[in-house]
UniProtKB/Swiss-Prot annotation:
GO terms for cellular component: cytoplasm. Belongs to the RRF family. HAMAP family: RRF. It is found in: Cytoplasm. The keyword Protein biosynthesis applies. Its main location: cytoplasm. Responsible for the release of ribosomes from messenger RNA at the termination of protein biosynthesis. May increase the efficiency of translation by recycling ribosomes from one round of translation to another. Keywords: Cytoplasm, Protein biosynthesis. It comes from Ureaplasma urealyticum serovar 10 (strain ATCC 33699 / Western). This is Ribosome-recycling factor. InterPro entries: Ribosome_recyc_fac (IPR002661), Ribosome_recyc_fac_dom (IPR023584), RRF_sf (IPR036191). GO terms for biological process: translational termination. GO terms for molecular function: ribosomal large subunit binding.
Length: 183
């Protein structure tokens, strides 16, 4: 019985869970400016909805400031109105050819709520790992012999791998919580 086949499949699915966690954590604003905050904002550009990062150069000149410089100066008002409509909680400051977004430092209460949301994301990731584990068990039962030693070995290896993956999730969540709570 070869556990490595199952382990490889589980780790591939776990990588998808980590990517999902990363995307969810990007949505949690820590007060620092990051271009990823603007992912998902679409601008009405000549009749088609276009992602903002395809219309402008986005940079971080200061830790709490995003600078957005549209490639086409005529689209600056459209970009600013799309940012306003996105409910980021930031008012764009429009200059001649650049838009500045200044993010306020989150209060203690807001940081605690963000840390709580980070924990919820971690719990959801653990649930996803449990689903992956269950799928692996079902696949093993369907494809394996009925030798009791093989079943015990598989179960032990699967439990160890699940614990390892959950520890990795906890480490990522702990790091994010520290990041959020840092003033």
């Amino acid at each position: 019985m070869n556990f490595k086949i199952y382990e490889t499949k589980i780790r591939e699915e776990f990588e998808l869970v980590l990517k999902w966690m990363h995307n969810e954590f990007i949505k949690l604003r820590t007060g620092r400016a990051t271009p990823a905050i603007l992912d998902g904002i679409l601008v009405d550009y000549y009749g088609s909805m276009t992602p903002i990062n395809q219309l402008a150069n986005i940079s971080v000149p200061e830790p709490r400031v995003l600078a957005i410089k549209p490639y086409d100066r005529s689209s600056i008002k459209d970009v600013a109105s799309a940012i306003n409509a996105s409910n980021l909680g930031v008012n764009p400051q429009v200059d001649v050819d650049i838009i500045r977004l200044t993010f306020a430092a989150p209060t203690e209460e807001v940081r605690k709520n963000l840390a709580k949301k980070a924990k919820q994301v971690g719990e959801e990731a653990k649930i996803r790992v449990r689903h992956i584990r269950q799928e692996a068990q079902d696949l093993f039962k369907k494809n394996s012999s009925t030798v009791e030693d093989d079943k015990k070995f598989f179960q032990t290896e699967l439990d160890n791998l699940t614990k390892e993956l959950n520890k990795e999730i906890e480490a990522v969540v702990s790091h994010k919580e520290k990041d959020i709570m840092t003033v």
